Each structure stands twice: as C-alpha cells, then as structure tokens.
C-alpha cells in the first residue's frame, strides 16, 4: 500500500498524485524514452517547451544527487512492514555505497528494495536516456549547456559501469553483475520487471 504509512523524507505530506515514494532510476527514464520516440516518429516538437526543459534539469540534478558523491542526499524511505524488500535498511538510506560514479536506485522496477544500491541495468538505461535528452536539447531547445552536462554524466556512468559492474564469475568468467555497491560486493541475478538484462535490447540499451 502507499499513501499515509511511510516515514522519512519528505515526511507524510506526499502529493495525492504520488502513490508511493520509492526511488527508482527507471521512473525518470521512461518519460524520456516516450518523449524521444514520439519526437522521432511524429516529428512534433511542441511538447519540448520550457517546462519540459525544467523537468530535464530536475532529472539531471536527481541523477547527480543520487551518485551520492558529496552526501547521502535528501531521499530516504522507511516503512513499517513485514517484508524486507518493501523498505530500506540503514534508517531508510539503504545499503552503504562507494561513490564511484554510478547512480543509486533504492528500489528495483519490481518495487523491491535493492540489495546493493547500484542497480546496473537501470544505470545502463540512464546512460541511454541521458544521451536521448541531450539529442533533443541540442536539436530542439538549443540548450548546449544542459546537453553537454547530460552527455558528460552519461559518459561518467558508462565508465563506472565498465570499471565496477563487470566482474569475474567463478563459472562464466567476466559478466555484468545485477547490483554492486562499489566496494566489491555484487549480486548475480535478473529481475522479472523491466528494465532488466532480459529487456535491455527492447530499451535500445547496450550492456
């Protein structure tokens, strides 16, 4: 269930438009994917107004914030529940991560809490989405500043994936972990919901 039972930032004053405040990277990627392909298929640029531009600035800012380089950021989530996967440990901050350039996703697309905060398929999705945003910003809004920042962030996350998410499996050799923490911990699995490794091709996302 959602409204009224959660504690932590931003308190219990959540908007009626928000069912629950589980932070997932893909929640910001899907609107970008929809807008990008609408533009490519229809050619309509009227949707990319100043409000859209402000929203993309917020997406960029949120991704940067959730790299957790300077602090944990304002987001935390705690819920009274008998399911471990329905809340975050560590007083709502989730498992500790090493700020190596990857983006924290507190929850998976399945709504289960991540075991380790760096959910790799979602980071790969973010790379694709940031580059799609940059393409629109350059072609439609002539906003080279935000476009450049999005491209730089995509490149940083991509390099961090290569360095920290490709690990040695005792049986299969070098593989992508599903989640990592930047300290060396990793989990090998895939999740049923999209985006996951099974769905990457459908999301124009490369591993």
Where are these regions (language model features)?
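An acidic intrinsically disordered interaction segment
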Residues: 1-3, 80-99, 162-169
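Aromatic-rich carbohydrate-recognition surfaces in CAZymes
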Residues: 1-85
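Active-site-adjacent bridging/hinge elements
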Residues: 2-10, 96-108
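Solvent-exposed loop and edge beta-strand segments that line ligand/cofactor-binding
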Residues: 13-26, 109-123, 179-197
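Inter-helical turn/loop segments and adjacent helix faces that build the functional surface
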Residues: 38-51, 113, 133-149
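A conserved active-site cap/scaffold subdomain adjacent to cofactor or substrate pockets
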Residues: 121-134
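Acidic, glycine-rich loop-and-beta core segments that form the ion-binding/anion-interacting portion
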Residues: 146-184
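Conserved small/polar residues in nucleotide/adenosyl-binding loops
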Residues: 198-207
């Amino acid at each position: 269930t959602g409204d009224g039972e959660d504690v932590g930032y931003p308190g219990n004053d959540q908007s009626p438009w928000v069912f629950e405040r589980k932070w997932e990277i893909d929640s910001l990627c899907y609107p970008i994917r929809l807008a990008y392909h609408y533009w490519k298929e229809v050619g309509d640029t009227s949707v990319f107004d100043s409000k859209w531009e402000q929203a993309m600035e917020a997406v960029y800012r949120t991704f940067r914030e959730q790299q957790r380089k300077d602090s944990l950021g304002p987001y935390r989530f705690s819920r009274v529940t008998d399911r471990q996967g329905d809340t975050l440990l560590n007083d709502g901050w989730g498992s500790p991560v090493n700020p190596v350039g990857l983006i924290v996703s507190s929850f998976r697309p399945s709504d289960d809490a991540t075991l380790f905060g760096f959910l790799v398929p979602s980071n790969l999705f973010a790379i694709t989405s940031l580059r799609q945003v940059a393409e629109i910003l350059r072609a439609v809004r002539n906003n080279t500043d935000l476009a450049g920042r999005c491209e730089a962030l995509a490149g940083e996350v991509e390099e961090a994936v290569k360095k920290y998410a490709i690990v040695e499996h005792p049986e299969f050799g070098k593989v992508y972990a599903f989640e990592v923490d930047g300290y060396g911990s990793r989990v090998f699995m895939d999740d049923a919901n999209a985006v996951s490794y099974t769905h990457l091709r459908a999301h124009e996302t490369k591993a």
